[in-house]
């Protein structure tokens, strides 16, 4: 098996078919002829990524498809224009994610899965922009590693996966666990149904995916954190998964002002910045304290100077929070 590589080492080449000429009415981009391929960099056009043949037509799901989708003149360095409400967006992280995904496909490894059938998508066209991206666990325990499902935020107006779930999943994979990023319909109820469907899909295909289903976790930022809390607390079956689908061992939540408790909430880790104008750290702290008072294991962190949507918190006081969260989850399994 080919080793996986970081963006600094990856020799991933964009398709020789060239750069984007235009966009069709359904949002699918086309190719222009004559441009040379090159390595993934900050200057790589986003549409070159979307239309890369290695991505088999689902490249569009790497980026927002609803609110502020990318335009044909944007490069990876322009991604922040597509991600309202987010901060600490690092182009190097984006390049790392794209390089990883293309290198996986170049090595003929599958990482995208439809969670709905063709018949279901034909009956409900909104399901076309859903799916599950897998970042496979690396290291000796990869063949039997546990899994986490990460839901990006976006205010239930779009899915900010390239900043708020893909980097998390890649970090988890490099830490020896399976990370799955769900691309969902931007509506609170439908998003939870898509997350529950993703969880049941993983359980149903556990052997094919080589994952350990015991003690899994749900992660999310902002709106995605609400999804993790709702599906984690009420259980996947409450949102359409088969009856008996287990609840997660832990919910990992970033920057959400949610304060709803279900009475069956899993162990919960939460973090937020003290300058978040969307999710009050005091509200989050009060929620975690109330949950802890019921005997549920909790851990809470507030980071000085950070605003909403800091993702991995690269080069900030929050950097490394994901390793703390991973340790918290493992302690609950």
Model-inferred region functions:
Residues 145-153:
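Short beta-strand element of the alpha/beta-hydrolase
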Residues 296-333:
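C-terminal catalytic histidine-bearing segment of alpha/beta-hydrolase fold enzymes
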Residues 1-15:
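N-terminal secretory signal peptides and thylakoid transit peptides that target proteins
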Residues 270-272:
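Short beta-strand/loop motif that positions the catalytic acidic residue
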Residues 162-179:
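Short amphipathic alpha-helix adjacent to the substrate-entry channel of hydrolases
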Residues 14, 23-131:
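N-terminal targeting or regulatory segments adjacent to alpha/beta-hydrolase or S9 domains
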Residues 275-279:
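Acidic catalytic loop of the alpha/beta-hydrolase fold
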Residues 197-264:
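Primarily recognizes the serine-hydrolase "nucleophile elbow" in alpha/beta-hydrolase
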């Amino acid at each position: 098996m080919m080793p996986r590589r970081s963006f600094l080492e990856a020799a991933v080449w964009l398709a020789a078919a060239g750069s984007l000429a235009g966009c069709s009415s359904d949002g699918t981009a086309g190719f222009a002829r004559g441009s040379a391929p090159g390595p993934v960099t900050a200057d790589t056009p986003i549409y070159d990524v979307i239309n890369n043949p290695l991505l088999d037509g689902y490249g569009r799901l790497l980026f927002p498809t609803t609110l502020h989708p990318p335009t044909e003149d944007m490069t990876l360095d322009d991604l922040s224009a597509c991600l309202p409400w987010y901060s600490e967006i690092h182009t190097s992280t984006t390049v790392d994610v794209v390089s990883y995904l293309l290198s996986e496909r170049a090595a003929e490894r599958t990482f995208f899965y439809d969670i709905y059938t063709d018949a279901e998508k034909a009956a409900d066209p909104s399901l076309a922009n859903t799916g599950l991206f897998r970042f496979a666990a690396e290291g000796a325990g990869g063949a039997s590693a546990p899994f986490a499902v990460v839901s990006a935020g976006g205010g239930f107006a779009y899915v900010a996966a390239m900043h708020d779930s893909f980097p998390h999943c890649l970090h988890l994979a490099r830490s020896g666990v399976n990370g799955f990023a769900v691309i969902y319909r931007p509506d609170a109820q439908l998003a939870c149904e898509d997350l529950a469907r993703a969880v049941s899909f993983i359980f149903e295909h556990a052997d094919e995916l080589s994952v350990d289903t015991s003690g899994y976790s749900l992660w999310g930022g902002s709106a995605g954190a609400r999804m993790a809390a709702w599906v984690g607390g009420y259980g996947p079956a409450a949102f359409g998964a088969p009856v008996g689908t287990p609840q997660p061992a832990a919910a990992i939540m970033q920057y959400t002002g949610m304060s709803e408790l279900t009475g069956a909430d899993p162990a919960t880790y939460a973090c937020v910045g003290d300058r978040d104008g969307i999710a009050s750290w005091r509200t989050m702290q009060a929620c975690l304290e109330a949950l802890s008072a019921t005997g549920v294991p909790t851990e809470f962190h507030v980071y000085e100077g950070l605003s909403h949507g800091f993702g991995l918190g690269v080069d900030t006081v929050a950097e490394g929070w994901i390793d703390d969260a991973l340790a918290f989850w493992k302690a609950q399994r």
